[in-house]
A protein has these predicted regions:
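Carboxylate/His-rich catalytic cores and anion/metal-binding grooves
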Residues: 40-55, 164-165, 471-493, 531-553
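Membrane-active amphipathic alpha-helices enriched in small hydrophobic residues
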Residues: 632-650, 654, 667-737, 744, ...
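Acidic/glycine-rich beta-solenoid
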Residues: 31, 60-71, 84-85, 105, ...
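Intrinsically disordered, low-complexity, serine/threonine- and charge-rich segments
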Residues: 840, 853, 859, 865, ...
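Amphipathic, membrane-inserting segments
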Residues: 736-857, 861-864
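Short turn/helix-capping motifs enriched in Asx and small/polar residues
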Residues: 354, 537-554, 578-579, 584-585, ...
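Thioester-forming pentapeptide GCGEQ
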Residues: 1-41, 46-47, 170, 176, ...
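A motif-centric feature for acidic-aromatic and gly/ser/thr-rich catalytic loops and repeats
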Residues: 510-583
Length: 895
């Protein structure tokens, strides 16, 4: 990374008098010596402090913002309008539930609830319900823990019934029926902490899982339905003190090792080998100071000279001042086609070095890719809709396309240029891909998808000739994929932990493939499948990828194995269309972008951009937001019992019974009063404890944060967000343990992850920006205004003194006495009394103390003022010490 690229490219944030961020200014430079371009992102708020509009740098002068919001009087979102994803309007009920919804596709949605505000039906007006839910009542069988649980779901994919639950709510037995009326029953056994101990899939194959004392997965066994004993799939696994996987021994005796930099927790090397044999995989990683991958060295690659070139197997990467990938080099043997479809096997004789250059517009759209290669180079461009971020393949001189023909009003792409047509269902899920249109009266070749609860559960590929119809049907079940063909073949693909898949044919397997073949995948840091091995550690296939997911090299060991590799880039399944299924969306690797807009609006204002245009650092687990692979994913991936831990915390979080709390008390309770009540302090303490641990762990991965600062910020995020959530639940009389289902847990986890990531990138976490303004009534503004001007060490000493039981006044006087500065009158007697009533206990976390210091929120300043805070100061000190060319960040107030 060149220092000159990052010289004088700060990131600035401008706040208004309420402490709300109204401008974010970034400076872009992509080459040494070039002038930095100023990029301004704008936000607008209503009088209540709620955000109502946002403009990215590309649309900064437009009349229409990228996103606009209309809120109810209570602050709930009523309408969201996006230039990428269209508009959606929600009519909430008295308890905040979504009763009716309208959208830009002309659909009027109706939701029906029972007396406990549980959804019982969802559908479009004038049509049968798309989803219906059935819940067990008080008369249900208590021995199977059914009472209050959802026991049946009917949707377009068929029927799902749940017969038994664990004590902590895990589904122990479920049956799914598709349109063929064949029941598929899956069973799970849970431990006392709700971890899965055993799973029997719909094919009768049984997985057993064993854990160490810390609850981390240690061993995995598999017993096929036709076998009488189990075989080891994962023989052993070890973890370091931070919970990171450091060693795993597979059932094929391949030992994989992960080494991490002790200074920051980043992956330093990845190695896999059978004892006494040459390494099968050995990568070494080089990073810049902020965590961008600069170089990947392949130590197992044998350098070759070909066509007057040295091909050494290493890969190098360059970035602009916004940390977007601008250059990548490596080697390939399969120039990426500019069309849909699966990759074809490579010709090893065509191996060459390549260099790719990437250009972006001010909205973050990748508009040009130049692929430099001795033979087979190319340049590809995208034309972006002037009024949105919708884009299409285009070359200079081509007429401008009609974007309305290629995208619907919700931003779903209807046709891939020079490729298939895409059809979307009412829920904006890809329903059908037309692979080939027949003009001779035959039905079109197509692939059709069905979903349940937001996840794909079935796909069917059909192709037609004049004499016959061929099909491939895939059913997705817990731990199992059932793949059937028109020739009678039925393949059970058993998915196991440790990146292992077992191929079990009910009848005779294809030639050159053993039945019950175990396929072990050796992945890179992004989870991409690079090397497939069988149970004897023999190589089945090798594959490498370009940075944005296209296949650069694919060498299968036999033609028979070609059709049975489905999981590829980033550990995702590639369909016959060439699209990757991520869960919430589909990704087109040849376009380097999603084919539908991000309906969650979680990953920035560009709803089509892929992993912040930094695909070597970020991964997207489900198609909603890019996360740093080396920090957040490792952090949350090692938590084996998230669901049970969240349930236990939520139960304690709820605290005492609230049945006797009057409605008038709930109605008049303010957030500040609640925060300093017993319930509020309990909620903050519990949430801050969890947040401090997460923040500290995040700090170990991001040196700009540091463990202590990470813990403080994590405590502040966790405590404040948790207390606010508990306050809202208190106002409505809802218990967290009942309300936090899987989707909510995912959203809360992502909020914490986003907060940690914001800090790592030198920004105030969004959750703090959104919530701190509600804590503005403090009795000690004078003290805090002065404390925030101190250096970070004095601030930490001040926090420690309060943590030890000293009052705010005493701690302030002690620091000032140490500096031999005359003390002013600090507070009136009433203010002092107010401080003492909320004085923290000795056992409270430092994150809670920081909240005490900042409970007045982001201090009011004249609009447009910019100040550098303590966290940024510490980050700058770190950068000076490491000489990191990181852009400086300025904030309005101090943590």
């Amino acid at each position: 990374m060149s220092r000159s690229i990052h010289w004088h490219t700060p990131s600035l944030r401008v706040n208004d008098g309420r402490g709300l961020s109204v401008r974010r200014v970034e400076y872009l430079r992509d080459s040494s010596g070039a002038e930095a371009e100023r990029l301004v992102t704008r936000q607008r708020y209503n009088p209540a402090g709620l955000q109502i509009a946002q403009w990215d740098p590309r649309h900064g002068g437009d009349a229409f913002p990228n996103q606009s919001h209309v809120h109810t009087l209570t602050g709930e979102p009523l309408k969201i309008d996006s230039v990428d994803a269209g508009w959606r309007l929600t009519l909430p009920g008295l308890a905040g539930e979504a009763l009716q919804r309208w959208d830009g596709r002309g659909q009027h949605w109706l939701s029906t609830y029972d007396e406990q505000l549980r959804v019982v039906a969802v559908g479009v007006e004038g049509e049968p319900a798309l989803e219906t839910f059935t819940y067990a009542d008080a008369l249900a069988d208590a021995t199977h823990n059914l009472r209050g649980q959802m026991t049946a779901l009917n949707d377009l994919s068929g029927t799902l019934t749940c017969d038994s639950f664990s004590l902590l709510g895990g589904s122990q037995a479920q049956t799914r029926i598709f349109d063929d009326d064949r029941p598929h029953r899956s069973q799970q056994t849970f431990g006392p902490l709700n971890q899965v101990l055993a799973q029997t899939d719909a094919g009768g194959h049984r997985q057993t899982l064993h854990y160490d004392l810390a609850g981390q997965l240690k061993q995995v066994g598999l017993q096929l339905a036709s076998d009488t004993s189990a075989q080891a799939v994962v023989q052993d696994a070890r973890y370091n003190a931070a919970g990171q996987l450091i060693e795993r021994l597979g059932g094929n005796n391949v030992r994989s090792r992960w080494q991490y930099d002790p200074a920051n927790g980043r992956l330093a090397s990845l190695q896999a080998a059978v004892a006494g044999q040459p390494s099968l995989q050995h990568f070494a990683y080089v990073y810049d100071p902020v965590g961008n991958v600069l170089r990947i060295e392949d130590q197992t690659f044998q350098p070759v000279y070909f066509a007057n070139q040295l091909i050494d197997g290493h890969r190098d990467f360059d970035y602009d001042s916004l940390y977007r990938l601008t250059r990548a080099s490596g080697h390939d043997a399969l120039p990426s086609p500019d069309a849909p479809g699966r990759p074809q096997p490579s010709d090893p004789a065509n191996l060459r070095n390549y260099t790719q250059h990437y250009d972006y517009d001010s909205g973050g759209n990748l508009i040009k890719l130049a692929h430099g290669r001795e033979v087979g180079g190319y340049t590809r461009q995208m034309l972006v809709d002037p009024g949105s971020n919708r884009a299409l393949r285009w070359q200079t001189g081509d007429p401008a396309p009609d974007f309305s023909r290629f995208f619907d009003s919700h931003g779903n792409q209807r046709k891939l240029q020079h490729g298939p047509q895409l059809q979307w269902n009412a829920q904006d899920q890809l329903q059908q891909v037309t692979l080939l249109k027949h003009d001779n009266g035959l039905p079109d070749d197509r692939e059709v998808y069905l979903y349940s609860q937001g996840e794909r559960v079935s796909k069917r590929q059909e192709s037609h000739t004049a004499s016959t119809t061929h099909f491939l049907q895939v059913r997705y079940l817990p731990g199992l994929e059932i793949r059937t063909r028109d020739n009678g073949e039925e393949l059970h693909v058993i998915t196991l932990p440790g990146h292992v898949r077992c191929l079990h044919w009910q009848a005779k397997p294809p030639a050159d493939i053993d039945n019950n073949q175990l396929r072990y995948s050796l992945d890179d840091h992004l989870g991409s499948s690079l090397l497939e091995l069988d149970q004897r550690a023999r190589v089945i296939s090798r594959e490498t990828y370009y940075p944005f997911g296209g296949t650069a090299l694919w060498l299968p060991s036999s033609s028979a194995s070609v059709d049975y590799k489905t999981v590829r880039y980033s550990g995702k399944e590639m369909d016959v269309s060439g699209l990757y299924y991520y869960g919430s969306r589909y990704y087109a690797p040849w376009l380097k972008r999603w084919v539908s807009a991000d309906s969650s609006h979680e990953d920035g204002l560009n709803l089509y951009g892929f992993v912040k245009n930094n695909p070597m650092r970020y991964v997207d687990p489900d198609g909603q937001a890019g996360l740093d692979f080396s920090s957040l994913l490792n952090l949350f991936r090692t938590t084996a019992n998230v669901a049970s831990q969240a349930h236990d915390i939520a139960t304690e979080f709820d605290g005492e019974d609230e049945a006797n709390v009057s409605q008038s008390t709930r109605a008049t309770m303010t957030f500040r009063r609640f925060l300093f009540s017993k319930k509020g302090m309990t909620a903050f303490s519990l949430s801050a404890t969890v947040g401090t641990a997460i923040g500290g762990a995040a700090g170990s991965f991001a040196p700009v944060i540091g463990n202590s600062i990470g813990g403080v910020v994590g405590g502040l995020i966790g405590g404040l967000a948790g207390a606010y959530i508990r306050y809202r639940f208190f106002k409505r009389g809802i218990q967290v343990a009942e309300a936090l289902h899987t989707a909510d847990l995912r959203d809360v986890t992502r909020t914490i992850a986003d907060g940690a990531e914001d800090v790592a990138n030198g920004a105030i976490p969004r959750v703090i920006q959104d919530r701190l303004t509600q804590l503005k009534e403090s009795a000690a503004n004078l003290i805090f205004d002065q404390v925030k001007e101190w250096n970070p060490l004095d601030q930490l000493d001040f926090a420690q003194m309060i943590e030890m039981g000293n009052s705010i006044n005493d701690a302030y006087r002690a620091i000032m006495d140490r500096a031999s500065i005359a003390l002013p009158q600090l507070a009136s007697p009433n203010e002092t009394a107010a401080e003492q009533t909320v004085e923290p206990e000795r056992s409270q976390s430092r994150g809670q103390v920081v909240l005490e210091l900042n409970r007045s929120g982001q201090f009011e300043r004249p609009a447009g003022s910019v100040r550098e805070q303590g966290l940024a100061g510490r980050a700058n000190s770190y950068r000076r010490a490491t000489r990191a060319p990181r852009r400086q960040t300025r904030f309005e107030s101090a943590v």
